[in-house]
């Protein structure tokens, strides 16, 4: 099999995950106070895993496990990337992640949304050029992006109605929109742009909601 034939057998990959979304936050699982019609419909068309568990249901450790396939404690991610610790918690650049593997196998790689695997910039400087505050961080192009080429992301910030992002420079992008809607539109734009190329794409779409504060949703969802 030559390289061209091998490429033609690879499908595009879209991996969507949301922060803190668990069994109790889905209407399809019979939770009376939860209304998730889109997810319920999606579940009806796909496969629902009712016995799947995170090895470490905390933001940074879980994400590190997802990216590397390793237990979080084995890669030093015993808590979140945050300020106020003597140890600088972050996913080490030398770890081989799924983005690296996919890129090495001919995929165009993309990451959109919350990252929370890089050490907060205020651990190193009080007033970083990127404007990152508290647990947040701008991850510049290079090895700390773990194999992802297209990048529209941030470290950790929970203002869902007024999110910000970074791409390939320290200037913040502030769309003034609810983060899941903006990120979904950018993901669709990416897939429409790259879906017809010779090389397949692998896109990771990481929503922050339903991470608290829970009330930060557009008013129409209260109707």
Pin down the residues of each PLM region.
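Formylglycine-dependent sulfatase
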Residues: 1-223
């Amino acid at each position: 099999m030559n390289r061209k034939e091998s490429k033609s057998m690879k499908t595009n990959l879209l991996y969507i995950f949301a922060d803190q979304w668990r069994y109790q936050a889905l209407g399809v699982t019979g939770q009376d106070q939860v209304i998730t019609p889109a997810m319920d419909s999606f579940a009806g068309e796909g496969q629902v895993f009712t016995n799947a568990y995170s090895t470490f249901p905390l933001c940074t450790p879980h994400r590190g496990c997802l990216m590397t396939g390793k237990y979080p404690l084995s890669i030093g991610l015993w808590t979140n990337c945050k300020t106020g610790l003597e140890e600088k918690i972050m996913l080490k650049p030398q770890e081989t992640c799924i983005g690296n593997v996919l890129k090495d196998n001919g995929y165009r790689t993309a990451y959109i949304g919350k990252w929370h695997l890089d050490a907060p910039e205020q651990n190193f400087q009080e007033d970083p050029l990127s404007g990152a505050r508290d647990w947040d961080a701008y991850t510049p192009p290079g090895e700390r992006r773990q194999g992802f080429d297209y990048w529209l992301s941030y470290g950790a910030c929970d203002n869902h109605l007024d999110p910000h992002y970074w791409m390939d420079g320290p200037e913040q992008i502030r769309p003034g929109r609810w983060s899941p809607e903006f990120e979904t539109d950018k993901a669709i734009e990416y897939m429409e742009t790259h879906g017809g190329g010779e090389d397949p794409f692998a896109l990771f779409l990481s929503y922050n909601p339903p991470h608290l504060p829970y009330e930060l949703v557009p008013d129409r969802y209260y109707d």
